[in-house]
Amino acid sequence: MSAIWGIVDLSAAQSEAQRKNRAGNLWEEALRMRQAYRTSCLDRIQEKREATYYLACGVQDVTREAVEERFPYERKGERRSLFVADVILDNRRELVQRFGSRWDLCSHPDGEILYESFCSHPEETLAVARGAYACAYLEPGKRTLTLFNDAVGNRSVYYFQEEKRVYFSTLLAGITCERENWKENTGWFDRFYTIRDLRAVSEPRETPYAGILRLAPGEIVVFTEEGVHRRDYWDPFAGRKILRGKTEVGYRELVTTVFRHCVEDVIREGRGGKETGILLSGGLDSNAVAAYAAPYLAARGKKLYSFTAVPEEKERARIPGQYAVEDERSSVELVRRFHGNLEPEYLVTNRGDLLAENRRLREVLEVPCKAVLNLPWMYESYR
């Protein structure tokens, strides 16, 4: 995935000296924010700066279309707007058919499709768009900045406002770099330690830093000179209904059809013909996904590359009945018998000091985490 960051000054007109001073400060802050992304695995940075704003996107070319992204996208004229997004869409064609002004958008990158859709039909786009995305939409003439993300929060963005200036960033470091001392959000830490399960937070908008917030799943936040307006644009229970009158076979067909579409829609051709991978265990969750993904790829002459964590030999040699790390090789090999295009890779990770691993991975996650058991091998797989 990519990353977005920026600074927007929403203050009204001032004296020429004040405007120059604020513009100079904004540029200094923009340079610090950009520096926070110097170690990120980005293919390129696309950015634009004027006196009252700085918008940037660090693009990763993870799909074939991503190579053509040209952030920030911009419409000129009376309704001038600019747009940056960290986005991978699952229903590109549907958005183009419904809201696109040009059919040739089907071959264009995800960011451009989402921008064109949102410009012409903002509310409908929020209701229809599927995928993983976090976006910033700026209307300079109105001095309005809109942040929004996908309905289930696959992606998010942090934000902070001070003196009518809004800072947003995919990485926390993009905001925390702007000052040396931040107050702790003691409520966040209190809840982190008192929740007696693997949930790290109970309030999705809060962060360990006082004043820095993040988009909740399915949220749109609008910043104007007058204030901040937040709302949830998606409710999973709104409009639900009971499907009656179907046979057992009919219900089964409905479920499998929806599941198949969900799996197939997220499979995208990578840049340079890169292949598709999956984190695969011996359980039903990941195997259900593999059961649809493998045949879909096989029909196109492609393989499905799986990654599975397995214990070291000393872990496997423990006495039966005692605590041990499960070795799921046999389960994966059984699945491989059914899907000839499955290419498994087994990752042996040292689980001896998970606390040390957690400290190392906290630099990646940027916030404390509880569920440390799976993080080392997942991190190695993603690398």
Language-model features and meaning:
Residues 151, 354-359, 379-383:
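Active-site adenylate/phosphate-handling loop in enzymes that bind or generate adenylated species
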